[in-house]
Amino acid sequence: MVQSCSAYGCKNRYQKDRNISFHKFPLARPEVCVQWVSAMSRRNFKPTKYSNICSQHFTSDCFKQECNNRVLKDNAVPSLFTLQTQDPFSADVCFPLNVCATAEPLSECFPEQCGLPDGQEAGAVSCPEQCVPPGGQEAGAVSCDHNYTLEDCVQQKRRVQRLQEQMEKLRRRMKTLQQKCRRQERQLERLRANRGPAPLGDRYVILPRELYEELQGVETIGAVH
């Protein structure tokens, strides 16, 4: 699955020719993970093992300098979430935003409407849903919130269905083998029941040893005479 950024309004996806790296949420460190989610300012967002944030939302001091690859420090927290997001690694990289052209500029959004404290500029944070003009625009042009969790759920559902089908095939195969084993066991029991002592026939007679020796002596005397 192609890696994509979970930040609000960010449309970055993994491409080899772009100097952008993607970093997974530190789910193993809950305290740092909470700081990441809080910095994103996304309501009802729950990161999964497939969620990523691109390197454009981290300052250069968040990365380990001694590593050849782009590796985050243990206490690194993303902080670049303004609409004028800058890439600390490459100034030539374009950072597109899918914002409707007919939407009202942020300068016309008052701090009281956006829930901002007095003295804070509106351009420093993302404007919430109350400042988005209702109706008249396509939903895909206004809402840039994406996490691709729906795609993950669909893939997981398909995988579960495939596993269930494989299990059903294995159950049927096991049942067939069990029936075959039972038939072979019954056939073996019938063979054992039918097997008896081998018939001696008309040419063989069972005699005591003493009588056999006497008869053998009589035959010897007859042969001499």
From Swiss-Prot:
Zinc fingers (THAP-type): give the ranges: 5-57
Per the record, the major location class is: nucleus
Report any Pfam family annotated for this entry. THAP
Question: One GO term of the cellular component aspect?
Answer: nucleus
Against InterPro entries, the record matches this protein to: THAP1/10 (IPR026516), THAP_Znf (IPR006612), THAP_Znf_sf (IPR038441)
- Name the SUPFAM superfamilies on file: Glucocorticoid receptor-like (DNA-binding domain)
Q: Which residues form a coiled coil?
A: 149-196
- Zinc listed as a keyword: yes
Q: Which domain of life is it from?
A: Eukaryota
Location within or outside the cell: Nucleus, Nucleoplasm
**Record key words, sorted:** Cell cycle, Coiled coil, DNA-binding, Metal-binding, Nucleus, Transcription, Transcription regulation, Zinc, Zinc-finger
Q: Which GO terms describe its biological process?
A: regulation of transcription by RNA polymerase II
**What family, per the record?**
Belongs to the THAP1 family.
Official protein name in the record? THAP domain-containing protein 1
Q: Which organism is it from?
A: Danio rerio
Q: What is the lineage of its organism?
A: Eukaryota, Metazoa, Chordata, Craniata, Vertebrata
Gene it is expressed from: thap1
